[in-house]
From Swiss-Prot:
Protein name in the entry: D-aminoacyl-tRNA deacylase
Domain statement: A Gly-cisPro motif from one monomer fits into the active site of the other monomer to allow specific chiral rejection of L-amino acids.
Gene source species: Limosilactobacillus fermentum (strain NBRC 3956 / LMG 18251) (Lactobacillus fermentum)
Biological role: An aminoacyl-tRNA editing enzyme that deacylates mischarged D-aminoacyl-tRNAs. Also deacylates mischarged glycyl-tRNA(Ala), protecting cells against glycine mischarging by AlaRS. Acts via tRNA-based rather than protein-based catalysis; rejects L-amino acids rather than detecting D-amino acids in the active site. By recycling D-aminoacyl-tRNA to D-amino acids and free tRNA molecules, this enzyme counteracts the toxicity associated with the formation of D-aminoacyl-tRNA entities in vivo and helps enforce protein L-homochirality.
HAMAP family: Deacylase_Dtd (MF_00518)
Origin: domain of life: Bacteria
Matching PANTHER family: D-AMINOACYL-TRNA DEACYLASE 1, D-TYROSYL-TRNA TYR DEACYLASE
Amino acid sequence: MRVVLQRVKEASVTIEGQVVGQIGQGYLLLVGFGPDDTEETLDYMVHKITNLRVFESEPGKMNLGLKDVDGAILSVSQFTLYADVKHGNRPGFSNAAKPSLAEPLYQRFNEKLAATGIPVATGQFGADMQVALVNDGPVTIWYEK
């Protein structure tokens, strides 16, 4: 599982001209799954993400977490995080989990995030989405398990 986390002032995801998910301050998560990901992988990622402290408690001190600032999460599935670009000029995606595995993992991941009490908005698995965001910092964290 790979997650790119971006601290944002706001973010939204649009499908066919309709906003389907949006948040104010919080995290935009770009989420990809590999073929060996399990419930244990989800639990690890949820713990790491929901306990991350990257909001300032005072100038220059990142000591507050998402709950401390009443933040939210926008979770967007993105299989292209598993792109293989070692050969040629066109990426390959054979390292990504098949949709039949990735979609239920994505749904469970979002359920587990929401179960922590943090508001969670989502995109739509497999859809062509337009993601808009206002980076805060910028702060970008890469998770992989």
